Amino acid sequence: MTIDEVQKLIQGIFDNIFNSVTSAEPGGKPVMTAATTVLSLMKPGMAINSADFRNPWTPGNVNGSQDAAINTARLVDVAPKMSAIYTDSGNTISQVYKQILDGVCIPAQAPNPAIEKQLADADAVLYRTVDMIDPDTGESVPKRIETQLYRDYLDNQAAYNAARIGYIGAYLEAQKTTSGKNTWPLIATTLQLPVRQAYDRWRSGGADRVEQAMAIINTSSQNALQKAFDQAKKTFEGYGVALDDSGTGMSTPIQRSSLLPSNWHSTSSTGWTSFDSAASTVATSNTSDYKSYGGSAGFNLGLFSIGGSAGHTSQSQHASAETTNLRISFSYTLVTIRRPWLTFNLLGTKGWNLGNLFSRGKVSAGGKANQGSSVMPLLPTSFVVVKDVMISASWSKSDMDLIKSKTSGGGGFAIGPFSIGGTYASSRSKQTYSAAFTGGTIRVPGVQIIGVISQIVPLCPPA
């Protein structure tokens, strides 16, 4: 199998997933804008042990798993580099965001009581202050969190977007073959039903009221920046929890985050879209981000990854030229990341700087280009989760021997972005997993994250 054949197959997977969120059926609107959306494939993928993320602790679920809450918070806190290959920058989102909140410098603005009242009224629709017990002192302290109305709005919006992405993915897949195009009108109405139901649920839950408040905040914040940043800091602190307490009372709070749907880590989760490289012509684009932002270079080193773990490869190896007819099939879904502690719209406002901390555009250059030295160019908003991964080929003897040894002997092993064996991510017990290999076909158990979809952080700081 040639390098070009491998590249075409991996790019086909990349483009298929990217197009499902940035394209739309005729007359429809894409869920995300291609110019500000980035897909980063992992090499290798991150295998998920459901037990590590099930039933996370929350203030309303004090009997939940604190480890699951910690694992979730850390999973979504990585600040990746601007690349089509998932690369950890070494920074965390919560760390950089806190630095921005602590270091923001805003020129003095004349007070405007009318605007401040408008901002306060809108803010009350989205956030509320509740009393919580400080685990270190036992005292009741005020915490600023989302209102139930706003939380339901965001959850229902995420469910609608997931339904839309599933529908668009099915539509795009159907358009690849003549039979698919011919049968699409027969199944489209049925597939539209969950989309319409999700939309009605989202819009009927006070969406107009929430969006009016959001619009007021987005416009008024520019005229009351200091107040807006002060409120954002209170919200950030309100979601900090001492889950990983060392007993000294000095542990750094963990920013509580969540993933939707709540059973995302299970194969029984809903909203899956199928992909089969043999079912249709694998569509690739000459202008694909895969080629423009490092995907080709990342997988040019070889189809096989040996050793390493999620997103980190120790050694790459090319498939033998004698291996032919490689076929990859899987089902994928997008898992929405919720960080209620992060007020993203503030990063797009003007009229502030970070003094000597970060110069103009150092956090993010605001686009896909010129982000090489940026501290936090991307904000991950979704994980690409897959299940039912099957990989088959007419393997050469050397490749078959390699696969047999790795699926039976343990150790980190991957094909393309798919992890075939190794240690589960986030598992304190260091549990391992491995795929089955029979009759030339590899069957991978469970679910794994093979990519991250991010939004580009606006020019930050703006001055």
Residue ranges: model-predicted function:
Residues 1-204:
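Intrinsically disordered, low-complexity, charge-biased terminal/linker regions in eukaryotic proteins
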Residues 2-9, 19, 33, 37-73, ...:
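Membrane-permeabilization and membrane-interfacing ectodomains
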